[in-house]
A protein has these predicted regions:
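Conserved AMP-binding/adenylate-forming core of the ANL superfamily
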Residues: 33-37, 43, 53-87, 91-99, ...
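A short helix-loop-beta submotif of the ANL/AMP-binding
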Residues: 90-91, 97-117, 121-125, 133-139, ...
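Adenylate-forming
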Residues: 97, 142-151, 253, 279-282, ...
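Conserved pre-ATP/AMP-binding loop-to-beta segment of ANL
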Residues: 183-201, 208, 238-248
Length: 300
């Protein structure tokens, strides 16, 4: 008789040290928590070293390995600290469509203990102003369109903008900053499990969008739970993955939403999954890429 999925999950947590569960007190309340070496996002993203030579991200004609991405994020992290004096607990916003720089910026921000604030890139200028004032960020990473929307009020709010894929802001240009700090290692910052990691905004369907703050532990726990459940389903259904085929997914939703950021981007670091990102959704183009890149999964 086959075990049900709950029994398999218990077996995995008892047998695999990556999913060991212990009771821990968080703010004087006892919880069941994962107890392993991946205690914060910096440690999650450092798993890139386990996937040497593996492709991590494909965007149009650009291809990045896990090593490439970590090197870019490390350079940008050093720029944040040295050029903009960003320190642990500071809030740094990202206002951009899906680009590789979005992912590498998020890695850099959270790896130095700062708080990443993904802003809805579909917002109007006034909505972006609301979000920026609400979260308290003074440094914003922007693409061309968001630069045009934010720059009219940037001086009034004392904001600094870092431009990606743009020639409008040469002083604080993402590529220029990478060139300055290229080759430097990721700064070593003491990050606690329950330090704040990110603020994601709700849709605002009944009023203004609300910022939802997540700790490093909260995000890591979510990723580990998904990983355990996926593993349990594979065992139940007797699915044996082909080790010669790299897991892969197509990112079809905005990274400012947790579906894109958590279940597609960050979850990939637990398995060395390849991510393919589209400039915009086009069914015909997506089908071609699914075939050529041998995409296994997508959601949206």
């Amino acid at each position: 008789m086959k075990k049900d999925i709950d029994e398999i999950i218990i077996d995995i947590c008892n047998q695999d040290p990556s999913f060991t569960i212990k009771n821990k007190y968080i703010r004087d309340i006892e919880y069941k928590c994962f107890d392993n070496d991946i205690s914060n996002l910096s440690k999650l993203f450092s798993l890139a070293s386990n996937y040497k030579g593996k492709e991590m991200l494909i965007f149009e004609d650009e291809r990045y390995t896990y090593e490439d991405s970590h090197e870019l994020a490390s350079a940008f992290a050093n720029a944040l600290i040295n050029e903009f004096k960003i320190k642990k607990g500071d809030r740094v916003a990202i206002a951009s469509r899906n680009y590789p720089e979005w992912i590498n910026s998020f890695i850099a921000i959270t790896s130095i203990g700062a708080i990443a604030v993904p802003l809805n890139s579909w917002w109007t200028g006034e909505e972006l102003k609301y979000g920026i004032e609400n979260c308290g960020a003074k440094l914003i990473i922007v693409d061309n369109k968001r630069y045009d929307l934010i720059s009219p009020f940037s001086k009034k709010l004392n904001l600094k903008l870092i431009s990606i894929r743009s020639n409008k802001n040469q002083k604080n240009n993402w590529n220029n900053l990478i060139d300055i700090y290229k080759g430097l290692k990721m700064p070593n910052v003491d990050i606690k499990d329950d330090d704040d990691a990110a603020i994601f905004y709700t849709s605002g369907s009944t009023g203004y969008p609300k910022g939802v703050c997540s700790s490093h532990r909260a995000i890591i726990s979510t990723l580990l739970q998904w990983s355990v459940i996926a593993g349990a389903r594979a065992i139940r259904d007797e699915i044996i993955p082909d080790e010669n085929i790299q897991p892969s997914c197509m990112i079809t939703v905005p990274l400012f939403h947790v579906t894109g950021s958590h279940s597609q981007f960050m979850l990939s670091f637990l398995s060395g999954r390849k991510m393919v990102m589209l400039y915009k959704w086009d069914p015909s183009n997506a089908l071609k890429i699914i075939e050529s890149e041998k995409i296994i999964s997508l959601s949206g």
